[in-house]
Regions:
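Bacterial N-terminal signal peptides that target proteins for export
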Residues: 1-12
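Bacterial N-terminal signal peptides
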Residues: 11-21
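Juxtamembrane cytosolic interface motif at the C-terminal end of transmembrane helices
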Residues: 21-27
Length: 148
């Protein structure tokens, strides 16, 4: 009987390990939203762009078509390289829960940030978020969350 238990436990373990990659792949999700940057404020320094400046905001979030308001976000960045990049941390709040991100925000071009977790439907979230400028003024951004 002990031999059968060992075989059963081994088969069960192998079965779980074989299915695990498919379960993870099935739970992968992409969420595309738009941030309208209307409250951004740079503080903690002169009016010049300089390392150490702090950017803060609490903006509204819209669906991918930029029509319907579906949430909000709030966060901060610290200027690291003048004219090039910020180091940021923020949370996007949606009806099903929140998603936290952290990483480098570039002054030009797309940025890729790490998803650091979430709440509600996004509890334990990981993956990356692509941030894309919708216009040259920097008043609207696509947030494309690639959840694992």
């Amino acid at each position: 009987m002990t031999g059968n238990r060992v075989r059963y436990a081994l088969l069960l373990t192998v079965g779980v390990l074989a299915v695990a990659p498919f379960a993870a792949a099935a739970s992968a999700q992409t969420i595309h939203v738009v941030e309208r940057a209307t409250t951004d404020a740079v503080t903690n320094g002169s009016k010049q762009d300089q390392a150490g400046n702090v950017l803060t905001w609490h903006n509204k979030i819209y669906d991918a078509a930029n029509k319907k308001r579906i949430g909000r976000d709030a966060g901060y960045c610290i200027r690291i390289i003048v004219g090039k990049s910020w180091e940021c941390s923020w949370t996007t709040y949606l009806e099903a829960g929140s998603i936290g991100v952290q990483g480098q925000f570039l002054d030009k071009g797309d940025s890729e940030l790490a998803i650091t977790g979430g709440t509600g439907a996004y509890a334990g979230a990981s993956g990356t978020m692509t941030l894309h400028y919708r216009n040259k003024k920097g008043t609207a951004f696509d947030f494309i969350f690639h959840l694992k």
